[in-house]
Amino acid sequence: MLAGLELAVREVNDSGGIVGRPLELVVRDTAADPQRAVAAVDELARLGVAALAGEYHSVVARAAAARADALGLPFLCSSAVLDALTEQPTEWVARLAPAQSHGWQIYADFLFSAGHSRIAVAADPSVYWASGARILRDYLAPRGGTVIELDMRALDPTAVCDELVDNRATALLLLVGHPEPAVSIVKSVRRDQRLAEIMIGAPAGQPEFAEWVTLLGDDSAAIPFLRYLPERLSPLGARVETALRERLAEAPSFVAFEGYDTVAFLADVLRSYGEDRARIAESWPRVAVEGTRGQIQFSRTPDISVWQWAWTPIQVVDRDPAEPDRFRILHAC
């Protein structure tokens, strides 16, 4: 994400900045810690920033959004998908990434269409994973599907394999952290001959990381996950992809595009509406910007408390078993 943010800031400044003034990016690492996020929002507000951008971790983004809302600080959330970013509807927060309920329903539809009706989820305790499991259950249960929850506080990877066999699951979804315990679970399942036919999935996108291939090798492939990219990038998206690839020395993930699009949108807002925080927040539904993955425009969406881009393109993809560095598109929406 940071690479995308920084690239966009550099391009804005190379083209003259904001009405002749340079755009400054002030970075604070929240380190997946909600308390650090709240402290960072407080600090950045005191420093006089015009708006907040970023955040990958959903639970952390929720803490940041609540604080930004309380302080009257515009926050364009780049990547976090948890539906309830704020407890009450707010004018101060907008989001690029699709809501979890939207993306994970698409993933559930992919599973069901592929013939999976007995689905186990290896889940860590968190609001995000619990929400994901509920979305899957709400989609699959009316269609005759079953979601079997495996509490990873009580099971090691070997015990997970036994549970999969006992419950006759045809798919296992990794609703757990990366690299651990996700990597250890994949290794155990792949080595268990009883589970040779089971599909492993990771809707939250852990296989997107290059480290996934480094740690798992051939076992990294054929694990479908969600990513938020179109089937074909626009000319802008293709140009940004090339620049990001040079910057990162590897193919960029969709999160880098989210970072770039965040700054592209905010820069347009700042040019048109200035630096006043209230005017920035008022602009969310009034601005349309061509991003790397389509035209970005925010609106009110049922059951979503923030201004939402509805929706970014969504794919279900996996790594190709014949070439794990290459992605296969399995389903697109």
Predicted regions and their residues:
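Extracytosolic ligand-binding ectodomains
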Residues: 1-333
